[in-house]
A protein has these predicted regions:
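A cross-family detector of function-defining hotspots
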Residues: 44-166
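Helix-centric, low-specificity signal for extended rod-like, repetitive segments
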Residues: 1-2, 22
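Sec/Tat signal peptide C-region and signal peptidase I cleavage site
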Residues: 27-33
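Short, recurring structural edge motifs at helix starts
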Residues: 34-38
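Bacterial N-terminal signal peptides
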Residues: 14-26
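Bacterial N-terminal signal peptides that target proteins for export
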Residues: 2-17
C-alpha cells in the first residue's frame, strides 16, 4: 500500500536528522599544510625531496636546496635541531621540510585570476607595488609584485605546529 505524504515527509525529516547528527559526531578532519609536488612541510624528508626534484642546482651552508623547475626555481629548507629546540617540537621532525619557496619568473597569475581578494581564508597586506596574501591556517603565502605572482611559500599549517609540539 502506498505511504501517505505525511509518512514520507516524516521519514525524510528523520533521515535528514540522523545524517546531521552523524556528521556532527564524526571526528574533525586533520588540517595539513599545503603541499607542492607531493612535498609537505613537517612530513617530507630530505631524501624524498631529492627523489621528487632530482639533483639541486645549489645548496646553501645551512642546507637549503635550490632546484630549477618549469617556470622558475624552488628553494626547500629543512627543520634543524635549533628550530626543534626553539619551538619545542618532537625531535623526529628534524630533517623534514620546513619551507618551500617557489620563485615564478614569468607568471601571468594575478590576485584576481586566483580569486584571492574574495577568499576569506587569506589576509591581504599591501605596500606600494607589493601585495601579499597569507593563509596561516593552511600555511601558504602568495607575493605579487606589480600585479603578477612572484613567489609562493608553503610552510606548516597553524594546527600542525601545535600537534608537532612535545
Amino acid at each position: 500500500m502506498a505511504r501517505s505524504i505525511t509518512q514520507r515527509r516524516t521519514s525524510l525529516v528523520t533521515a535528514s536528522l540522523v545524517l546531521g547528527v552523524l556528521a556532527c559526531m564524526s571526528p574533525p578532519r586533520e588540517a595539513n599544510a599545503a603541499s607542492w609536488q607531493g612535498i609537505e612541510p613537517f612530513k617530507t624528508h630530505r631524501a624524498e625531496v631529492l627523489q621528487i626534484l632530482g639533483t639541486p642546482i645549489s645548496e646553501s651552508a645551512d642546507g637549503v636546496l635550490r632546484f630549477s623547475v618549469s617556470g622558475g626555481s624552488v628553494q626547500v629548507s629543512f627543520v634543524n635541531e635549533k628550530f626543534v629546540t626553539a619551538k619545542k617540537l618532537r625531535p623526529e621532525l628534524a630533517g623534514t621540510v620546513l619551507l618551500i619557496v617557489l620563485q615564478h619568473e614569468h607568471s601571468s597569475e594575478t590576485p584576481e585570476s586566483m580569486n584571492l581578494p574574495k577568499n576569506k581564508g587569506f589576509v591581504r597586506d599591501e605596500a606600494r607595488t607589493i601585495v601579499i596574501f597569507r593563509n596561516i591556517k593552511d600555511g601558504i603565502v602568495y607575493t605579487f609584485i606589480d600585479g603578477r605572482l612572484k613567489t609562493t611559500r608553503y610552510t606548516f599549517a597553524d594546527s600542525q605546529l601545535s600537534r608537532a609540539r612535545r
